[in-house]
From Swiss-Prot:
It comes from the Bacteria. The active site is at residue 84. Its EC number is 2.7.1.21. SUPFAM superfamilies: Glucocorticoid receptor-like (DNA-binding domain), P-loop containing nucleoside triphosphate hydrolases. GO terms for molecular function: ATP binding; identical protein binding; thymidine kinase activity; zinc ion binding. ATP binds at residues 10-17, 53, 83-86. This is Thymidine kinase. It comes from Thermotoga maritima (strain ATCC 43589 / DSM 3109 / JCM 10099 / NBRC 100826 / MSB8). The gene is tdk.
Amino acid sequence: MSGKLTVITGPMYSGKTTELLSFVEIYKLGKKKVAVFKPKIDSRYHSTMIVSHSGNGVEAHVIERPEEMRKYIEEDTRGVFIDEVQFFNPSLFEVVKDLLDRGIDVFCAGLDLTHKQNPFETTALLLSLADTVIKKKAVCHRCGEYNATLTLKVAGGEEEIDVGGQEKYIAVCRDCYNTLKKRV
């Protein structure tokens, strides 16, 4: 039986990692073997753990290239969990397809859009393959409504790949994005 791909996406501060961690917990409670991964580039909260903004976390294999996952996935692995997929190169798509064909469920969390509203290529590829998409929203940093679907960069230059937290990025709704973008 083929595995299923679930992609959790949305802006920063929308609870993507928290949702991913809840699926890890469900698999562990079900006594299913899991493998958890994060990109080496993301060491904001911890170097070897996936940690949510709320502080919850789980140990993870830290890798640079998606192909490195294969050495950590054992014959009896039932679930693979990957955080911050936007930071991986597009070869993650082929690795995930292989895992699904092997009957392993895969859960991915990551940003869908850059702060310039351009799609992250790796996330877009995974969304095209997904059996289930969970599109998260956040509370808009400016108006306070629970309608934020975009991430706005407020400090640190224009680079689209620039790891950071609240010191660089805020979640905003489209109206507030357009208003604030004129000022930034």
